[in-house]
């Protein structure tokens, strides 16, 4: 592939689907705090003036779903009824049952390492050396734009901003290398009393310029800031939100394949989540070790079975060692059985709410972002 464009998008913590994700993961964290062995599949639906929390949960813990929901919405910034959604007055409904005993008998084992996968499925992990966090640049900078929007909204720099926002960045590539940014889209919810010209100037100066590297911007870069001209009605008043509806935003922005399973609200026994994290960990360590410039991992499972049904390594012709050797290294250094990867990444802790906005990958504070096996892989591969 010679010259081409590639685009990724992100959404802010105040986007309706992300509100739902954060509530689901806040419930999960509260339960794991008391009961690390809990089985949680928590789904959330948000619309004007209401939140519905449902799913299947089996636990010895007791948590206050209503309080968790209100606190999460409050932290995001929906605290006035004029936004169409208010943490203090929205209705909170709960429809939670227990996990099926048919699933439990396939997952639970006396020997923990033989714990079966909570479902069948396929998961992907990806890494590339085009950014310092070993993530694709388009999704990385799309996330950083909406993170910056939240920052200047919350610290009072731009007090007329509201929680809902979206970003989209189109990068120019030449022979696989970034040569510039072709287009930037940023749409942000705002108060009624800000005019379009003032908004566009402030967004450019306070959000876009501090985030996007100047060497990638030029006179032909196109900027679309609130291109409809008005974005007052937003959040759950503008659109309903559902857990698990932003799976490409959550992962690699379309640069890598996706197995289809969402993450938020699921405890680590659900391989949709935990194995996707493990696949990222494997791919990132392979790239960090210098064994490839780009790496995509696929892993698959059968419900109730511990060993993965398949492991694939794709390096797009950038590998520095034979592909067959990479597979052997993965099997030697990474335990991808469900309980093995939970142990490997220390996943039975309340760390999930933070993942639910601005991407699950590329932020160094998560355990699956460690590159602690890179040197081991490099030595085992015989690279100097």
Swiss-Prot record:
Q: Which UniProt keywords apply?
A: ATP-binding, Cytoplasm, Magnesium, Metal-binding, Nucleotide-binding, One-carbon metabolism, Potassium, Transferase
Query: Which residues make up the binding site for K(+)?
Result: 43
By its UniProt entry, which Pfam families does this protein fall under? S-AdoMet_synt_C, S-AdoMet_synt_M, S-AdoMet_synt_N
> Can you name one GO molecular function term for this protein?
methionine adenosyltransferase activity
Binding-site residues, Mg(2+) = 17
Q: Which InterPro entries match?
A: ADOMET_SYNTHASE_CS, S-AdoMet_synt_C, S-AdoMet_synt_central, S-AdoMet_synt_N, S-AdoMet_synthetase, S-AdoMet_synthetase_sfam
The protein's annotated catalytic reaction(s) are: L-methionine + ATP + H2O = S-adenosyl-L-methionine + phosphate + diphosphate
Supply the enzyme class, top level.
transferase
Cite the residue spans of the region called Flexible loop.
Answer: 99-109
Gene Ontology biological-process entries: one-carbon metabolic process; S-adenosylmethionine biosynthetic process
Q: Where is L-methionine bound in this sequence?
A: 56, 99, 239, 270
Which residues hold ATP?
A: 15, 164-166, 230-231, 239, 245-246, 262, 266
**SUPFAM superfamilies per record:** S-adenosylmethionine synthetase
Q: Which family is this sequence assigned to?
A: Belongs to the AdoMet synthase family.
Query: What protein is this chain from?
Result: S-adenosylmethionine synthase
The taxonomy runs: Bacteria, Pseudomonadati, Pseudomonadota, Gammaproteobacteria, Enterobacterales
| This protein's encoding gene | metK
């Amino acid at each position: 592939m010679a010259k081409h464009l590639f685009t990724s998008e992100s959404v802010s913590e105040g986007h309706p689907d992300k509100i739902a994700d954060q509530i689901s993961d806040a419930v999960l964290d509260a339960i794991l705090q008391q009961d690390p062995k809990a089985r949680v599949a928590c789904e959330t639906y948000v619309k004007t003036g209401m939140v519905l929390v449902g799913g299947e949960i089996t636990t010895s813990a007791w948590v206050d779903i209503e309080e968790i929901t209100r606190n999460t919405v409050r932290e995001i910034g929906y605290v006035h009824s004029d936004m169409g959604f208010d943490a203090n007055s929205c209705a909170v409904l709960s429809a939670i049952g227990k996990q099926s005993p048919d699933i439990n008998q396939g997952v639970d084992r006396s020997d923990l390492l033989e714990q079966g996968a909570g479902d069948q499925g396929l998961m992907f992990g990806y890494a590339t050396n085009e950014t310092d966090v070993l993530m694709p640049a388009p999704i990385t900078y799309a996330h950083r734009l909406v993170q910056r929007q939240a920052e200047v909204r919350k610290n009072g720099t731009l007090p007329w901003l509201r929680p809902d926002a979206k970003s989209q960045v189109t990068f120019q590539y030449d022979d696989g290398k970034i040569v510039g940014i072709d287009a930037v889209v940023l749409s942000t919810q705002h108060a009624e009393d800000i005019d379009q010209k003032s908004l566009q100037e402030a967004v450019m100066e306070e959000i876009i310029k501090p985030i996007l590297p100047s060497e990638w911007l030029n006179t032909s870069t196109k900027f679309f800031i609130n291109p409809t001209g008005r974005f007052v009605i937003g959040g759950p008043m503008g659109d309903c939100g559902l857990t698990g509806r932003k799976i490409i935003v959550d992962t690699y922005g379309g640069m890598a394949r996706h197995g289809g399973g969402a993450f938020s609200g699921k405890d680590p026994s659900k391989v949709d989540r935990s194995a996707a994290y493990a696949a990222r960990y494997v791919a990132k360590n392979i790239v960090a070790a210098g064994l490839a410039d780009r790496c995509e991992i696929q892993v698959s499972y059968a419900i109730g079975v511990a060993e993965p049904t398949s492991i694939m390594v794709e390096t797009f012709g950038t590998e520095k060692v034979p592909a067959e050797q990479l597979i052997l290294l993965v099997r030697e250094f990474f335990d991808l059985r469900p309980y093995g990867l939970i142990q490997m990444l220390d996943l039975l802790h309340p760390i999930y709410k933070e993942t639910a906005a601005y991407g699950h990958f590329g932020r160094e504070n998560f355990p699956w972002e460690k590159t602690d096996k890179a040197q081991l892989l490099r030595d085992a591969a015989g690279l100097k």
